[in-house]
Amino acid sequence: MKIKIALCDDDAKALPVIAGAAESAFQEKGIYTDIQRFNSGKALLQAMEQTRFHIVLLDIEMPGMDGIAVGKRLRELGDGTHIVYVSEAESRVFESFLVQPLGFVRKSNFLNDIAAVVELYVKTCSQDERGDYLEFQTRSGLLTLKSRQIRYIEGSRNYQ
């Protein structure tokens, strides 16, 4: 099984470290990852117009649009992406609850916290949630549907 993960952190040095550790934690559970890295919330949101991610690993304190604001915007989009905050801003953990994240990973305790979040993901997210999606490009952006939500598809003109 392979899942798509978006990693968003303004610290360029942290991106490869977090990506590598997250990839290892998921592989230990038999889940392979495709991790895309973003250095701003704006870049992440732009990418999400074209791509669906299963999980977003999101720093909180970033210039411009902070991680809480990005999380709120993701919830407004309503695609069911799981948000995991990865941050040194431990004092903002309660503020993150407004976004209903899957978890909060402290950078100071990263390896233990990421392992716990991966375990939670495996236990709470059914096979259907981790895969079995169809994506359609529309004029207004990317539309993602669970295959069980689709009752009928009709093509016209040059569509197949």
Label each PLM-derived region with a short phrase:
Residues 35-42:
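Conserved Asp/Asn-Gly motif in the active-site loop of CheY-like receiver
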Residues 45-127:
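CheY-like receiver
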Residues 2-22, 56:
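Conserved acidic segment of CheY-like receiver
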Residues 7, 37, 85-86:
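Conserved SAM-binding loop
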Residues 21-28, 47:
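Alpha-helical interaction/dimerization surfaces of two-component signaling modules
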Residues 26-35, 81:
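A generic structural motif
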Residues 115-160:
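Conserved binding/recognition cores within well-folded domains
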